[in-house]
Amino acid sequence: MKNPALLKEIKTYRGRDEVPEDFDAFWDGEVKKVSTLPAYQLEERDFCIPQVKCYELTFEGTNEGKVYARVVLPKSEEKVPIIFHFHGYMGRGWDWADMLAYTVSGYGVVSMDVRGQSGYSQDGLRSLLGNTVKGHIIRGAVEGRDHLFYKDVYLDIYQLIEIIASLPQVDEKRLSSYGASQGGALALVAAALNPRIQKTVAIYPFLSDFRRVLEIGNTSEAYDELFRYFKFHDPFHETEEEIMATLAYIDVKNLAHRIKGKVKMITGLDDDVCYPITQFAIYNRLTCDKAYRIMPEYAHEAMNVFVNDQVYNWLCGSEIPFKYVK
């Protein structure tokens, strides 16, 4: 296994900045504001798929955002467990066909489009439909924590879970979250803000340890807006402390201590988008039941060799083998 120095560092690294003193009070207050179940529309769609019911869910999120999610439920007389899937930065939720694999094991799947990215959810900024990236990380950081884009996304997730948990066909005690990159971060956020989430799989999670990202000089597509903010708006870094203090409220490593369910994290050691060190800033702050897998030859890319089977097993309790069967 290559890079032993990095492997040694990531096992104890907890990030560059500490959690703000009022962090939990802030998020408890924000969650309380949206604790009443919002009005929503759940419309069934007939796609001629036997044994499965498909729905489109829409509701109004914070700051006039419109949130859209696909919902797939196996036809069952029993209440069904749910897997919440979250997509990568600038992307959109799973296609309907992608969601069907889990229904074979009796699980429902909910896949939310993040507002303002490539799906059907609408950004509350004048209710624009479609892509408003880039700039989602940094949006609102100058104005303060109440204006952060991801604050609203995190609250969308909390409300989504509450809506789905309230459905009569759903087993509210068996909810899981899953995603990669931005989706991995949001899967962790789901567990941190809503204790209904019992299991989480996070593959190379994004949105962590912003100070370290800045120090590394990460100009990859996902983080370049942070780099560009300072290059073109504050080249002398006169606002760095203020910006970092504000972004701390959406830094996923700072939410880690709130997670009570089980967590599995998967990391590619060659990841130059969401650096492994920033991912383990999250992992090492988790106080729950946790485990990680490292893939030394992988970067920030599709992990299709055995990984999908492992994720499926862990979420569904199946026993697909992790090696070639002769």
Regions found by a protein language model. Give the residues of each.
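Short beta-strand/loop motif that positions the catalytic acidic residue
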Residues: R258-I259, M265-T267, D271
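Cap/lid segment of the alpha/beta-hydrolase catalytic domain
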Residues: W94, L100-T103, Y107-L155
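Hydrolase active-site cap/lid region
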Residues: V189-H237, I294
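Gly/Ser-rich "nucleophile elbow"/oxyanion-hole loop immediately N-terminal to the catalytic nucleophile
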Residues: H136-S181
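Acidic catalytic loop of the alpha/beta-hydrolase fold
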Residues: L269-C274, E301
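N-terminal targeting or regulatory segments adjacent to alpha/beta-hydrolase or S9 domains
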Residues: M1-V52, Y324-K326
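Histidine-bearing beta->alpha loop at or near hydrolase active sites
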Residues: I294-Y312
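N-terminal cap/lid segment of alpha/beta-hydrolase-fold proteins
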Residues: K33-E77
